[in-house]
C-alpha cells in the first residue's frame, strides 16, 4: 500500500509538472505533453533527489552533469517537431531522460554518451523501463553516429561553441537539429532546418547547459 501511494504521488506530481510548468508556458504539442506526463522522471535521478524530480529546475546526476529542467526538455523536444516515423540522434545521453521522452514519440532513438558511468546507468534504466527503441553508444558524441545516418532529427543536450558540421552532414534533408550554442557559460537555443540549398537557423532564446566535450566541441580541462 505504501508503494502504491508513493506511485500515485509521483503520478500527481508529474501531472502538475505538465500543467503548471510546461503547458502554461506554451508547449502545446500533444505528443510532447503526453510523453512528459508518462515518463517517470524521478527514476532518472538518485533516490535522494526523487522528491525534487518534478520541480522546475535541473538536478545533478553525478560526473558534474545534470538532468535538464522539465520545461527545457519539453521546449527542445517540441522544437524538433518530432513525428512517429522519425529516427532521432541524441548527443549526450546523460541521465537518459531526454532520450526516454523522445522514445515515446518517435520510431527510434540513437543516443551517444562519452561518460562511461552515465552510459551504463542509462542503458540499464532503458532496459528496466522497457524502452527498447533506444539504441545506446559509448563514444564521443560530437562525431555523431555515421553508421546509422542520416537522421531525421538531431538533438544536442550540452552547450557547443558551434554546431559541428559532421552532425549537420548526418542530418537528412528536411531534418531538424536543436542545440544550445554559445560560450562555456551561456548559450542560445538554436534550431536548424536542413534544406536542399543549405541550412536555415532560428534563435529560440537563451539557455544554459554544461559544456559539450569532444573532438568537435569544447576541449576537456
Curated annotation (Swiss-Prot):
Q: Which GO terms describe its molecular function?
A: protein-L-isoaspartate (D-aspartate) O-methyltransferase activity
For this entry, the protein name equals: Protein-L-isoaspartate O-methyltransferase
Q: Which catalysed reactions does the entry list for this protein?
A: [protein]-L-isoaspartate + S-adenosyl-L-methionine = [protein]-L-isoaspartate alpha-methyl ester + S-adenosyl-L-homocysteine
UniProt keyword Cytoplasm present: yes
> What are its E.C. numbers?
2.1.1.77
Which keywords fit this entry according to its UniProt record? Answer: Cytoplasm, Methyltransferase, S-adenosyl-L-methionine, Transferase
Report the principal subcellular site: cytoplasm
Its subcellular locations are: Cytoplasm
Coiled coil location: none
Species in which this protein is naturally found? Desulfosudis oleivorans (strain DSM 6200 / JCM 39069 / Hxd3) (Desulfococcus oleovorans)
The protein's superkingdom reads Bacteria
List of catalytic residues: 68
The record's section on CDD domains has:
AdoMet_MTases
Amino acid at each position: 500500500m505504501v508503494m502504491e501511494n508513493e506511485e500515485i504521488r509521483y503520478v500527481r506530481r508529474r501531472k502538475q509538472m505538465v500543467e503548471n510548468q510546461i503547458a502554461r508556458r506554451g508547449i502545446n504539442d500533444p505528443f510532447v505533453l503526453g510523453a512528459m506526463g508518462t515518463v517517470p522522471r524521478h527514476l532518472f535521478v538518485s533516490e535522494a533527489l526523487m522528491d525534487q524530480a518534478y520541480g522546475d529546475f535541473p538536478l545533478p546526476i553525478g560526473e558534474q552533469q545534470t538532468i535538464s529542467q522539465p520545461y527545457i526538455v519539453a521546449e527542445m523536444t517540441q522544437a524538433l517537431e518530432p513525428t512517429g516515423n522519425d529516427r532521432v540522434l541524441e548527443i549526450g545521453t546523460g541521465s537518459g531522460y531526454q532520450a526516454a521522452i523522445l522514445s515515446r514519440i518517435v520510431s527510434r532513438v540513437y543516443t551517444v554518451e562519452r561518460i562511461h558511468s552515465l552510459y551504463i546507468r542509462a542503458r540499464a534504466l532503458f532496459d528496466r523501463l522497457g524502452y527498447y527503441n533506444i539504441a545506446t553508444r559509448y563514444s564521443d558524441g560530437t562525431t555523431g553516429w555515421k553508421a546509422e545516418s542520416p537522421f531525421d532529427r538531431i538533438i544536442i543536450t550540452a552547450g557547443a561553441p558551434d554546431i559541428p558540421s559532421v552532425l549537420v552532414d548526418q542530418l537528412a534533408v528536411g531534418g531538424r537539429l536543436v542545440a544550445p550554442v554559445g560560450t562555456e557559460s551561456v548559450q542560445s537555443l538554436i534550431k536548424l532546418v536542413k534544406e536542399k540549398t543549405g541550412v536555415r537557423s532560428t534563435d529560440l532564446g537563451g539557455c544554459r547547459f554544461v559544456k559539450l566535450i569532444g573532438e568537435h566541441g569544447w576541449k576537456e580541462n
